[in-house]
């Protein structure tokens, strides 16, 4: 059985509430509850400490998105609104915003090189069919050349549910390193400085 078949039957597995809700020294959990207008997007900044980037070992950034669109059980496209996310690194927010903004078909889209778009598993083709999406970017080498800020782009795309003008959603991000390094305090300080 392949990963897609297992996920289709079992979902993302059994929840560990404590693991999902709390951080520890080498694993940080961040979340936001928000809403987006149809055919709009939001960019969330994710601080990535130097210690996480350069310390040897396996490190992951896991993004999970959940939303509650109107549904019809009698349609092939049963979900009335589509949502998706991407994890981008090494780019300025202005370039990301320009890339994802809605534009006329004849207008060129500024490119974001593949090296700046984090490869996540499962990929977008598999996960975007669902109202609960989760994917992980895994890094094994030094990633400091991409900078200390990554960005999560959350998009909301109108479907057949024309009576809806905004869609609620929640997003959770887990930043984790297999080495027992102190990233919680570093991320917390950077978030408090912004707040």
Indicate residue ranges for each PLM-predicted region.
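Hydrolase catalytic cores
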Residues: 1-4
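Secreted peptidase-domain scaffold signal
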Residues: 8-95
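Generic intrinsically disordered, low-complexity segments enriched for polar/acidic and small residues
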Residues: 9, 19, 28, 97, ...
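Extended low-complexity, serine/threonine- and proline-enriched intrinsically disordered segments
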Residues: 60-128, 168-174
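C-terminal edge strands of extracellular/lumenal beta-sandwich accessory domains
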Residues: 79-93, 138-195
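Long, low-complexity, intrinsically disordered terminal regions
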Residues: 113-136, 144-158
């Amino acid at each position: 059985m392949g990963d897609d078949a297992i996920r289709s039957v079992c979902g993302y597995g059994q929840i560990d509430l404590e693991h999902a809700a709390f951080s520890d020294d080498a694993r940080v959990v961040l979340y936001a509850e928000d809403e987006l207008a149809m055919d709009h997007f939001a960019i969330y900044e994710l601080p990535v400490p130097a210690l996480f980037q350069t310390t040897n070992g396996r490190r992951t950034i896991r993004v999970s998105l959940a939303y509650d669109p109107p549904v019809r059980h009698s349609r092939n496209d049963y979900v009335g609104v589509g949502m998706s996310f991407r994890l981008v690194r090494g780019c300025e927010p202005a370039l990301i915003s320009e890339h994802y903004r809605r534009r006329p078909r004849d207008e060129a889209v500024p490119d974001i090189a593949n090296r700046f778009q984090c490869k996540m598993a499962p990929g977008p083709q598999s996960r975007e069919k669902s109202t609960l999406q989760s994917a992980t970017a895994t890094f094994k080498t030094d990633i400091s050349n991409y900078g200390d800020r990554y960005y999560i782009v959350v998009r909301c795309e109108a479907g057949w549910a024309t009576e809806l003008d905004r869609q609620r959603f929640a997003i959770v991000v887990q930043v984790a390193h297999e080495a027992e390094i102190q990233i919680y305090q570093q991320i917390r300080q950077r978030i408090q400085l912004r707040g």
